[in-house]
Design a protein with these regions (language model features):
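C-terminal nucleotide
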Residues: 37, 41, 54-189, 199-202
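Glycine/serine-rich anion-binding loops at beta->alpha junctions
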Residues: 1-15, 183-199
Length: 202
């Protein structure tokens, strides 16, 4: 649906799960995810591995990647948290975004590429760890603040790699909307970002 909701991955996971159940293949959820990923990367979609996380359903799951290795950990919030997913009624090109961000690997050729590596490396690792702790504590205020921080770093480091897609005017209008501020703790873009969807902590 081109909104950053992993919709193509959801179809791939559903297909893998259907084959698993119909033919009693005895695959784990991780096995279904791997089949779905291998199937999807043969298409123009070229999704990342995170998209197959939809296989876990409505549970909060931390996914850590190291090359082709994937580690998962279920996170149990201390209390309910409320998220709002917003269709920005604009457009994004995930394939182009990922193509441009991937130019930063394996070697950074300039300052923009170094910034992307900084963002997706140490900055991301620190914010994700803090977000995990906020989720476990059920701390919506802290989680919202971390989303805002993550978005600011994304704007600083990733947007220059693909400004046509990552300037995201519709997303930033929502995040800066004065009438919305009393009702949310913070928010950010979804997935590879762009003007597909936004996510807010209410």
């Amino acid at each position: 649906i081109k909104k950053g909701h992993s919709s193509s991955a959801a179809i791939s996971v559903l297909t893998a799960r259907a084959f698993n159940r119909v033919y009693d293949l005895r695959l784990t959820v991780r096995g279904e995810m791997e089949l779905a990923y291998q199937g999807e990367i043969t298409t123009p979609s070229r999704c990342g591995r995170m998209d197959q996380g939809c296989a876990f359903g409505d549970r909060a799951v931390l996914m850590e990647f190291d090359g082709d290795r994937l580690a998962t950990e279920e996170i149990r919030p201390a209390k309910d948290l409320h998220f709002v997913i917003v269709d920005l009624k604009a457009k994004k090109d995930t394939v182009e975004i990922l193509k441009r961000l991937n130019r930063s690997y394996p070697f950074a050729e300039g300052e923009v590429e170094k910034g992307v590596q900084e963002l997706l490396g140490p900055v991301n690792k620190r914010i994700v760890q803090q977000a995990k702790e906020a989720l476990q504590a059920g701390d919506a205020c802290r989680l919202g603040a971390l989303m805002g921080e993550a978005q600011a770093f994304f704007d600083r480091y990733a947007a220059p790699a693909c400004p046509e897609e990552l300037t995201s005017p519709a997303l930033h209008r929502v995040l800066a909307h004065e009438a919305l501020r009393p009702h949310v703790w913070g928010g950010k873009g979804v997935g590879s970002q762009g003007d597909g969807s936004g996510q807010l902590v209410a």
